[in-house]
């Protein structure tokens, strides 16, 4: 019996654990947002942690009093998080494959300015493989890992690429200094131990190798403006970095930041409108009807609501 099945009858609070700051290790914090456990999906961690999961924040968010990192504490137990990510299907996520290919084509334009040789590239949390598919078409030697086996199978059947099921720490390709580039697209904030992930990235990268991370920036002007209504305040996001804390954790794990920039992503208009439904419930019916009437549902739309892209190099 899975942990999800055994714990199904427990209350949401019974499934939580306290964690220290991942950046400085201290356990001294100020609560930024109080919990809303009454809104939690207590019995469906597979639904909660699917790739298109959009449950608004129910766990308490805290800010470390020593380094300023913001994170969830307490949060769902690590085994629950990993099992939730590993199970289930997500047709909604893969419906946006073409839009994500559009985004990643532009991302690779930037990557190739820093690494024009197009060597070996590893995508962590590769989801359904859109980035790896685009990278392979452009001449990169690709590798990837993804905890959700259904996503791995989808990538194999639709793109013809193999993604290793599991986390970064399950990779069979584990030789030191194996890769020229490692990418984490909307991944680092989901990992239970972000620092451990970055240390493993440093081990796998060649000296001077490139690390690309994009993340929802809690320090962005739109996040500050929207407060608790910011669209990236989600239960699946365990860490909330700003430009200072992302720089600190990268420097602590052997990297030098070369560039920080706003990161635009592309999705279909209808998909974006549906994601906005919890925040604009009064407007969604009108927007939905108009988009259908005008044929806008499938239109690809670039959007920015606080995402930041970091380009860093491994020291040495």
Residues of each region from the PLM?
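Short Asp/Glu-rich motifs
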Residues: 40-43, 83, 154-155, 174-175, ...
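S-adenosyl-L-methionine
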Residues: 61, 69-74, 185, 298, ...
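Short, glycine-/aromatic-enriched active-site segment of Class I SAM-dependent methyltransferases
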Residues: 35-45, 213-239, 244-251, 271-275
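Extended interfacial segments that mediate partner engagement and assembly in macromolecular machines
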Residues: 50-150, 154
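Short functional micro-motifs and their immediate structural scaffolds
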Residues: 28-30, 72
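Conserved SAM-binding loop
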Residues: 13, 17-18, 29, 105-225, ...
């Amino acid at each position: 019996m899975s942990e999800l099945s055994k714990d199904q009858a427990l209350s949401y609070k019974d499934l939580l654990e306290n964690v220290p700051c991942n950046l400085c290790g201290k356990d001294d914090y100020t609560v930024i947002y109080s919990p809303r456990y009454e809104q939690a999906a207590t019995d469906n961690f597979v639904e909660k942690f699917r790739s298109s999961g959009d449950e608004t924040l129910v766990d308490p968010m805290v800010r470390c009093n020593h380094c300023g990192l913001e994170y969830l504490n307490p949060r769902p137990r690590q085994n629950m998080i990993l099992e939730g990510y590993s199970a289930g299907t997500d047709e909604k996520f893969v419906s946006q494959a073409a839009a994500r290919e559009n985004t990643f084509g532009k991302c690779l334009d930037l990557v190739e300015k820093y690494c024009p040789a197009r060597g070996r590239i590893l995508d962590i949390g590769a989801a359904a493989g859109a980035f790896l598919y685009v990278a392979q078409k452009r001449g990169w030697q690709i590798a990837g890992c993804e905890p959700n086996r259904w996503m791995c199978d989808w990538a194999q059947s639709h793109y013809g690429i193999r993604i290793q099921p599991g986390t970064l720490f399950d990779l069979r390709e584990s030789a030191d200094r194996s890769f020229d580039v490692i990418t984490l697209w909307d991944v680092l904030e989901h990992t239970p131990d972000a620092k451990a992930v970055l240390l493993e990235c440093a081990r796998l990268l060649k000296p001077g190798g490139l690390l690309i991370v994009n993340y929802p920036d809690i320090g962005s002007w739109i996040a500050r403006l929207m407060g608790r209504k910011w669209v990236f305040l989600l239960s699946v996001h365990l860490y909330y970095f700003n430009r200072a804390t992302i720089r600190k954790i990268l420097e602590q794990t052997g990297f030098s930041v070369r560039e920080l920039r706003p990161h635009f992503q592309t999705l279909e208009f209808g998909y974006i409108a549906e994601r906005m439904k919890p925040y604009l419930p009064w407007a969604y019916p009108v927007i939905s009807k108009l988009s259908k009437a005008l044929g806008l549902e499938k239109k690809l739309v670039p959007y920015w609501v606080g995402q930041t892209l970091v380009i860093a190099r491994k020291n040495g």
